[in-house]
């Protein structure tokens, strides 16, 4: 009897960690799916700006390039080059 209680408790603990579950929202009104990797639902990560562009990459203005570089137009294409 004691062994079966321990076994059922252990299986409940393991299944709670492995199987996807639900938890109550902070208000307690509705269930929310539980996730290990939570991302903000209202942010669009696809269009995040790049910190800066490296040498010989295309640019639109000098502020696109990394520090110490400038955007120069050559042969109809603008690229980041080291500033003198």
Curated annotation (Swiss-Prot):
Its main location: secreted. It is found in: Secreted. Disulfide bonds join 52-66, 59-71, 65-80. Keywords: Disulfide bond, Knottin, Secreted, Signal. One of its GO terms (cellular component) is extracellular region. It comes from the Eukaryota. Residues 1-16 form the signal peptide. Belongs to the UPF0499 family. The presence of a 'disulfide through disulfide knot' structurally defines this protein as a knottin. This is UPF0499 protein NCU07353. It comes from Neurospora crassa (strain ATCC 24698 / 74-OR23-1A / CBS 708.71 / DSM 1257 / FGSC 987).
């Amino acid at each position: 009897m004691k062994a079966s209680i321990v076994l059922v408790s252990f299986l409940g603990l393991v299944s709670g960690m492995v199987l996807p579950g639900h938890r109550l929202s902070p208000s307690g009104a509705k269930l929310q799916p539980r996730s290990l990797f939570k991302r903000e639902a209202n942010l669009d990560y696809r269009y995040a700006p790049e910190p800066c562009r490296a040498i010989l990459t295309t640019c639109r203005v000098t502020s696109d390039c990394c520090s110490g570089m400038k955007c120069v137009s050559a042969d109809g294409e603008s690229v980041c080059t080291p500033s003198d």
